[in-house]
C-alpha cells in the first residue's frame, strides 16, 4: 500500500516539476484477487480491467487491509491506518485525524482539479468529508454501506440528489462528465466503485447472463459458498468491467490515454466464500485470501506493457 501511495506521490512530484499526467484511480469494493479472468477465473470475463495489466504492470503480491476503511485511509495518505486514527469501519472509527494530508491535497496543490465518484468511507462530517480532504467535487456516499443500488439517493457536494439507474452506471456517468469537462487541464479522478459489496443487486441484463451459470470453480470450503450470491457477484463484476471500459474509451476518445495513469485495485478480500485462487480467507481475515488484492497500473510510454512485479 505504501508503494502504491509512493507511485502517486511521484506522479504528483512530476506534476510540480512540469510533467502533468492525469490520474484515474479505480477501486473495487470487496472484490477478491480471484475475481478476474486475468487471475484465472474462468467463470467470467473482465477484459477491460484485464487490459490494464496487459498494457501496463500487474503486481503479483500486493496486500491491503482485511476491511474497507483502513485500506482506504492508508491509500489516501501512504501511512499506516492506526497512525491516522482509523481503527474500524463504523461509529467514528473510520475517520482519519483532521491533521492528515491526502494525495488529493497534494495533487490540488500541484494545480490539478480533483474529483471523487463513489464510496468514501473515511468520515461523513466536516472536517472528515471528501471536500475537506482535497477533493473539489464529490458524487456518491460517505458511509461504508448503501442500502439501495437502483435510483439511489446520492450526495453531490453536500446536497442529496435522487439518481436514476444502477449506482455503478450513474457514478461512472458522473466520472465521465468530470473527465470531459476537465480534458484541457490535469485532473485526478478517483472512482471507488460500490461493487461487489452488498446488497447483492445488479441490472437485469447482467443477472440474466449469470443466474443459471454452472459454477466450475468454488470456494476452498464449498459448503460455505452460496451459489446465487457468487453468481450475483460475477454479474456485478461484469457490470463493473463494462464501466471500466467506458472510462478507458473516454480517455481514448479525448486523446488522453497516453497522458493518463490508470490504477485499479480492491480494498480487501472477497465478501463471500467463493473461488479466490484457492487461497484461505476472505474479507475480515488476515489469511492471504483476505488481504491479497489485484493491482494493475497502466501508464503508456512509462510502464512496460505486461510487466510483472513480484515484490511484496
Language model features: what each stretch is:
Residues 1-9:
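Sec-dependent signal peptide recognition
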Residues 3, 14-312:
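Formylglycine-dependent sulfatase
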Amino acid at each position: 500500500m505504501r508503494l502504491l501511495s509512493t507511485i502517486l506521490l511521484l506522479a504528483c512530484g512530476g506534476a510540480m516539476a512540469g510533467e502533468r499526467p492525469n490520474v484515474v484511480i479505480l477501486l473495487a469494493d470487496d472484490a477478491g484477487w480471484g475475481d478476474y479472468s486475468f487471475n484465472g477465473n474462468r467463470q467470467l470475463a473482465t477484459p477491460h480491467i484485464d487490459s490494464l495489466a496487459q498494457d501496463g504492470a500487474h503486481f503479483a503480491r500486493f496486500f491491503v487491509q482485511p476491511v474497507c476503511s483502513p485500506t482506504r485511509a492508508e491509500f489516501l495518505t501512504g501511512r499506516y491506518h492506526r497512525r491516522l486514527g482509523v481503527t474500524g469501519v463504523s461509529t467514528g472509527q473510520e475517520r482519519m485525524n483532521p491533521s492528515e494530508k491526502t494525495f488529493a491535497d497534494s495533487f490540488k496543490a500541484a494545480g490539478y482539479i480533483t474529483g471523487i465518484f463513489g464510496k468514501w468511507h473515511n468520515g461523513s462530517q466536516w472536517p472528515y468529508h471528501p471536500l475537506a480532504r482535497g477533493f473539489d467535487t464529490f458524487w456518491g456516499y460517505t458511509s461504508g454501506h448503501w442500502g439501495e443500488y437502483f435510483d439511489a439517493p446520492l450526495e453531490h457536494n453536500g446536497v442529496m440528489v435522487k439518481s436514476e439507474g444502477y449506482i455503478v452506471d450513474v457514478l461512472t456517468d458522473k466520472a465521465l462528465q468530470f473527465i470531459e469537462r476537465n480534458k484541457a487541464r490535469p485532473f485526478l479522478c478517483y472512482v471507488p466503485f460500490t461493487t461487489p459489496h452488498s446488497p447483492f443487486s445488479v441490472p437485469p441484463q447482467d443477472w440474466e447472463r449469470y443466474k443459471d451459470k454452472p459454477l466450475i470453480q468454488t470456494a476452498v470450503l464449498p459448503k460455505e459458498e452460496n451459489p446465487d450470491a457468487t453468481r450475483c457477484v460475477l454479474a456485478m463484476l461484469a457490470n463493473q468491467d463494462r464501466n471500466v471500459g467506458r472510462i478507458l474509451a473516454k480517455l481514448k476518445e479525448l486523446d488522453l490515454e497516453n497522458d493518463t495513469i490508470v490504477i485499479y485495485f480492491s480494498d480487501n478480500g472477497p465478501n463471500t466464500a467463493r473461488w479466490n485462487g484457492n487461497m484461505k480467507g476472505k474479507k475480515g481475515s488476515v489469511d492471504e485470501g483476505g488481504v491479497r488484492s489485484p493491482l494493475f497500473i497502466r501508464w503508456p510510454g512509462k510502464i512496460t506493457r505486461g510487466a510483472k512485479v513480484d515484490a511484496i
